[in-house]
Amino acid sequence: MEITSVELEEKIKNGEKVLVDFFTNWCAPCKVMKPMFEEASKKLIDENSDIKLYTMNIEKNTDYAIDVLRIKNVPTIKGFFGGKEVYHSTGILKTEQIIQVAKKL
């Protein structure tokens, strides 16, 4: 599910466990990772996990992604919990890696 900067800020302020894939439409590695991120999200939903996975198109949220979250490359995955960033990686993660990261938040 795609999320906006306003929605993400609200979830961070509420202390929710969220993992976000930051992407652009022109990024080839982003396109490769998209179905794996979606599959990981579905598996976590099926497990009734309290961790939510979202995507954010940084072209639609440029100022927030670059100035606030300091995204420099895509794909970038960031995890948030307890009101702060607790995970950051750049590059492709496979489905099981995404799930492992999410469960460690």
Model-derived features with residue positions:
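Short cysteine clusters
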Residues: 27-30
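Short acidic active-site motifs
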Residues: 7-8, 61-65, 97
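Secondary-structure boundary motif
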Residues: 13-14, 42-46, 104
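Thiol-based oxidoreductase modules, predominantly thioredoxin-like and allied folds used
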Residues: 2-4, 22, 34-41, 45-63
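A short glycine-leucine-enriched loop at secondary-structure breakpoints
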Residues: 67-72
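Short, charged low-complexity linear segments at domain edges
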Residues: 1-13
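Non-catalytic, surface beta->alpha helical segment in thiol-disulfide oxidoreductase systems
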Residues: 73-105
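Short active-site neighborhood of thiol/selenol oxidoreductases, capturing the structured segment around
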Residues: 13-25
